[in-house]
Regions:
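N-terminal beta-loop-helix "entrance" segment that forms/cooperates
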Residues: 25-48
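Helix-loop-strand module that forms the ligand-binding subsite of alpha/beta enzymes
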Residues: 51, 58-123, 128
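Short, small-residue-biased leader/transition segments that mark boundaries at the very start
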Residues: 1-6
């Protein structure tokens, strides 16, 4: 949904502030969703990334195990993409790059998009977790008392970036429950 498009754009914006090198692959459905739900153009999103690739470009450097990276975030991760990654169906650059992360034992974080979940979804998530992937459903948190949608979205962004050792000072962390006197 639109919160995912907003979240993913915010993630790229925060990564740009850290000077991290980012490589962006946008599926055709993601491109259509971005335009439909946010009004952003592909150029708006692509300019936030260091490099962008067509999902068809399986010869891109990120499709190789020799490409040096800290890992990969798939956001949003549809159940179709999740199933493709789990089964090694590397039929596009997105699933191929995720396959490379698994074979090279690199960090692979999947921000799954679906509710409710059926048994197939859960089994795919379990098997990918066993393979080393991190399933990070973008669920809102309320312990940080978000005041608006942006704060809810950024909580997920910060939790995702934490997986890569990118700890931003703007992130609100759990500090325990305040005891009433």
């Amino acid at each position: 949904g639109s919160e995912m498009c907003i979240r993913d754009r915010r993630m790229l914006e925060w990564l740009k502030k850290t000077d991290a090198e980012t490589h962006l692959v946008i599926s055709p459905w993601a491109a259509a969703t971005i335009l439909h739900e946010t009004g952003y153009t592909m150029k708006d999103v692509e300019k936030l990334a260091s490099f962008t690739y067509s999902h068809k470009d399986q010869a891109a450097r990120i499709s190789s195990g020799s490409f040096q990276t800290d890992g990969m975030i798939v956001a949003p991760c549809s159940m179709k993409t999740l199933a493709g990654i789990r089964t090694g169906m590397a039929d596009n650059l997105l699933t191929r790059s995720a396959d490379v992360m698994l074979k090279e034992r690199k960090k692979l974080v999947l921000l799954t998009r679906e509710t409710p979940l059926n048994q197939i979804h859960l089994e795919n998530m379990l098997e990918l977790t066993k393979m080393g992937a991190v399933i990070l459903p973008p669920m809102p948190a309320f312990y940080n008392h978000p005041q608006n949608l942006t704060e809810m979205v950024e909580h997920i962004v910060f939790r995702t970036l934490d997986q890569f050792g990118i700890h931003l000072s703007e992130a609100k962390r759990w500090e325990g429950m305040k005891q009433e006197k």
